[in-house]
Amino acid sequence: MKKTIITLLLILLATYTFAQFKCNDILQFGNLKSEASHAFTSRQSGVYKGGLNETARRMLPKEVPSYDGGTLAFRMKVDPAKQNYFTVRCFGSEKDKSMLMLFSEGKQVGYRHLGDIDLLSLGNGEAPIAGRYYYVTLPIPLKHTIGKKEVNLEIRSYGEIWGYGETFESYQKNMVDPTLGIYKAYTHTEPCFVPNKDEKQGVVPELKIRKTPGVEVLDALKNRVNNELNDIMAKTTPLSQLEMWFLADAYSVTWTPVYQNRNVASQIIFSIDDFYKRFLNDSSLVYSDKQVYNNEWLITGPISRAIRKLWKQLEPFADRTFDNGKGQLITHRKAWAELMQASLKYSTTHRRQYTNQSMIIDMFMYDCNKALALLDPKNALPEYQTLKYLHESIGLTPWLGRETLKGPEKPLGDNYLQLTHKGLTKELGFVGYYGEVLDWVVDIYKSTCVPGFPSTGDAQIREQLLKMMRTRSYFRYPSQDENGYRAMRIEAVVGWRDASHYPGNITYGDRAIAWDATPLMTAATTLDSCAVGMAQQMINDNQFFNMVDKKLEMKGIRVTKSLLHIPDEYEVIMKQKPANFQLPMTKGMPDFVFSDEEDGVIAVKNGDEILYVSLYWRARNAVNNLAKVHYITPTIDRIANLYIKTDFEDSGLRYVRPNWVNLAFSSGREWYKGINSAHEGDILPIAKIPDGIKYKIGDENSFAGKCNFYRMQYGNYVVGMNCTKDKTYQLSLPVSVKQTFNLSENKKLVKEKSIKVAPMSTVVLYVVK
């Protein structure tokens, strides 16, 4: 196959002008005349009257259950010389859990999971913007339209996917329900789709505060926790690691049935001893315990937590002996110390790069070492060493990787930080919901506290936690909950590791419904005024009880354990004075531009408009010149993949896109036989890799796809982002415009033809046509 350069010089070298938006073609689904004029055919689809009494088509599941469902095929007009885009119109009150993929000339556009060219839709069962329409835009492969006036397109439907599935059956679910409706399809050359004024649009309703549920959910919470604790205490068999941790944590909670219960210590001693006996038969148990999810990360961290929590109760028994299962007597102290040492040896040599994984591994490593210091101080690592690992994992000092016989591996060199200077996680760029790690950093901070004294933790970790929290606050946008009440949601559309997070989860400060998180944990732990303000905003919107109620629907011991401290945290926050802080995107708050040049992401509040953009977008292997946009207005939402202009230092190396259609980053799960990628053979340039960094073409690498400068024009917005530390770039203004305002400088009127963009800074302009 002839290889195609995707840098698209025709597009990137074009003069930036503002022209009246015009569609090349419009297809109205359910309108027989419109469908006939587009050579429309379908399989397993139906027409219905949907939002605002408009006609739509939705794809239906097959009569015999299958992972794939209905299809819509059609032909549309395109521009033969320019980059063309395809947009669909969907109604925001509709919800599904289906996946919709675009096909062009019989080949799949984009990837099914975390691709730089995204899928059309992956529903999460929630309505994203009730009562209004939203538009999703993808680029049509240039090689399918160059020199042509028409292109054959198709939308195919599939069941939902679970991104962590290791088999096709666990990854790809059958399609059992109809998809959301597709109302219209459009082709156009301007990346920011502008609907015709005649199209019906909804409006944001006046959002009310929900009245229920209320404080009664805390009673339900206590019932669940206490019932599970009673079940654990009634066991005559050894407890799992997570049960030990839960029990030890509950020992100091006054409203539980195990509060200062003497039998707790004996249960835990019996259970750790049993774990040790199994460890003697299989030393890998410290990192392969099947009762612990992500066992390689947690190691024997839960046991170490139990030891630390209850050391005052356990120490009197530490030097007593028990039978190790092989007819030999050993003290509890010696046996448990062996477990901690084995865990330390494994975790120090198996550290991981991705931020949340690094944090979890290093946190439980730290806990194991603290437990070892209680049991056998002479064999514990120095406190400064394990604390250094924590500092590395949260971006206070450079992350140096796993330990080797020659010292730290340093796979990313000497200066790679896990967080940006402004406090965002990097995987490799901006991470939305998946990158929300405040709960883990709170847990890390608590691990450094003296047990029973919550404000004695490492001061640098606390300060980093608060920086992260304030930065994350820009990525909460005003919306409504599933019942139409006022709520703030997390921005994840432009996140590298996020799929099916539109709409984002209801979030104010902490991730309310993550397994190990609570809605108020940062605020209750730090009592920082901004954190308390976020917590109070959540409580005032009555979303706190709603989130607790939702968490009660979740199953699993880690969820139940996380419920343990919610009542006390709520009591602490209710005692605080009103804080003078609201989330920045809250209606009525001042306009702003936030940018993070290391992650290549911006968040803009401009009156009633909100713009989120990842300019550095899923460029794992090479420069792709792609951005992802979530543009929120009072009447519509827009989600778009678009090509932008970049400047970078070319390594001379090239990455050729393989024929992958599932994961954009791996061939490991290519289960969709007979489907070919529309991007196979596309050639992408690779940015210069710093000296000393191990790299081969095709590797995921934080330097391979990162550019020095990004320039994006999207609708009325023009963005220039300078990611260098020592270069200055010029951002040219579009021609043929009336006025230009610099949003980065309080909407200052721009009179120059270009603006300097200083190192590590971003300029956002708003152009009036």
Where do the language-model regions lie?
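Solvent-exposed beta-strand/loop surfaces of large extracellular or lumenal domains
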Residues: G110-P128, G698, Q739-S754
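Bacterial Sec-dependent N-terminal signal peptides
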Residues: M1-Q20
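Aromatic-lined, polymer-binding surfaces characteristic
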Residues: N226, N230-I461
